[in-house]
């Protein structure tokens, strides 16, 4: 079914504006038959953040911003889905065009600006599917016009705690002016303290929902030192490494798009984000697991992220170029690697290459 969907949809979607194609893809997923997914190889199961993931391959925030198709995505074989970014109030985001394909680089530039339906609408959808099971995380952010951005995060934690499998505190999008300033030490410490306090306030009624922090790949190593130290001291449950980058590699072939503002994702982000995974893994010293994201487009790329220090991985941009069949392909490659090397689980290789990667010259 997935192969047929890809064969039909990928050529068609390439003919459309990138954002229109994305909208059509979400609508198409909602129309797919409710086919029960094949069981995953038990060796791919991952225990992280107090949750049991059937496999390590998730879909990153940004694809299903408004929780319109989480169950369809789970049925397609993802081990978990992250919806959002959600803000307290609905917002339109930045003016179009704001999403651009770099086809020769298998990359995307976006400056979406947290366009979403707002907390009330997204909560209603998640509450309606609450009995469906599966791990569905909620990525939360601040409204562009907010006068108290920390209060936005706190309100979202309190609102979504009953329906979120986990939270991702997104302070790393480059498309909301000033948002990345929340990664600075004093601001981040205050934010995480208040977010964790909010989680504790609703613990009795909503449970102990894990809180993850998503960071930018553009941090310096000194800044990363501070971020990881604060994350550990505030006892966050994990980190997602990393968001899109503002950097533009001179190796990019799609030169006509180099001046487009926004975050770059896809294959050109792979090396930088993998280095950041390894650097974060070394600094975390086992305090919490990591989700690796950025440029994963094959089983080999997923394995590299895991060996750099990621317990789980997320995809998005590669799906635009390779289709939804990529999910099963990555899982099959990971299972084959475990079988070939005689290992019982992916946890045995998490971070195996981190010392080697971090010894390389910086910046990459």
Curated annotation (Swiss-Prot):
Pathway(s): Pyrimidine metabolism; UMP biosynthesis via de novo pathway; orotate from (S)-dihydroorotate (quinone route): step 1/1
Protein's UniProt keywords contain Oxidoreductase: yes
Cofactor(s) in the UniProt record: FMN
Cross-referenced InterPro entries: Aldolase_TIM, DHO_dehydrogenase, Dihydroorotate_DH_2, Dihydroorotate_DH_cat, Dihydroorotate_DH_CS
Cofactor binding description: Binds 1 FMN per subunit.
Pfam families according to UniProt: DHO_dh (PF01180)
Assembly mode: Monomer.
PANTHER family in the cross-refs: DIHYDROOROTATE DEHYDROGENASE (QUINONE), MITOCHONDRIAL, DIHYDROOROTATE DEHYDROGENASE (QUINONE), MITOCHONDRIAL-RELATED
Cited function: Catalyzes the conversion of dihydroorotate to orotate with quinone as electron acceptor.
Protein name per UniProt: Dihydroorotate dehydrogenase (quinone)
Organism for this UniProt entry: Rhodopseudomonas palustris (strain HaA2)
Name of encoding gene: pyrD
């Amino acid at each position: 079914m997935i192969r047929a969907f890809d064969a039909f949809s990928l050529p068609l979607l390439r003919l459309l504006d990138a954002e229109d194609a994305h909208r059509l893809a979400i609508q198409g997923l909602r129309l797919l038959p409710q086919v029960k997914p094949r069981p995953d190889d038990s060796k791919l199961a991952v225990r992280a953040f107090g949750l049991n993931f059937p496999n390590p391959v998730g879909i990153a925030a940004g694809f299903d911003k408004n929780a319109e198709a989480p169950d369809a995505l789970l049925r397609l074989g993802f081990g978990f889905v992250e919806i959002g970014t959600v803000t307290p109030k609905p917002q339109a985001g930045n003016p179009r065009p704001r999403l651009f394909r770099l086809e020769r680089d298998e990359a995307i530039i976006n400056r979406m600006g947290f366009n979403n339906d707002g907390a009330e609408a997204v909560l209603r959808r998640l509450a309606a599917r609450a009995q469906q099971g599966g791990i569905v995380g909620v990525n939360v952010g601040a409204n562009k016009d907010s006068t108290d951005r920390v209060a936005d995060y706190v309100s979202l934690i309190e609102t979504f705690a009953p329906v979120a499998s986990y939270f991702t505190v997104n302070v790393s999008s480059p498309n909301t002016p000033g948002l990345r300033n929340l990664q600075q030490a004093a601001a981040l410490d205050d934010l995480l303290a208040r977010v964790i306090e909010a989680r504790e306030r609703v613990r009795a009624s909503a449970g102990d929902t894990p809180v993850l922090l998503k960071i930018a790949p553009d941090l310096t190593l000194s800044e990363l030192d501070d971020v990881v130290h604060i994350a550990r001291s505030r006892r966050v449950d994990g980190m997602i490494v990393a968001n899109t980058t503002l950097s533009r590699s001179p190796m990019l072939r799609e030169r006509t798009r180099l001046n487009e503002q926004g975050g770059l994702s896809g294959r050109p982000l792979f090396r930088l984000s993998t280095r950041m995974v390894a650097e974060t893994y070394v600094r975390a010293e086992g305090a919490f697991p990591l989700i690796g994201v950025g440029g994963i487009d094959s089983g080999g790329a997923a394995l590299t992220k895991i060996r750099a220090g990621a317990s789980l991985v997320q995809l998005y941009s590669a799906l635009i170029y390779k289709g939804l069949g990529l999910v099963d392909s990555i899982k099959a490659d990971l299972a084959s690697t475990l079988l070939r090397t005689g290992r019982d689980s992916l946890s045995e290789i998490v971070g195996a290459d981190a010392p080697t990667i971090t010894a390389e010259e910086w910046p990459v």
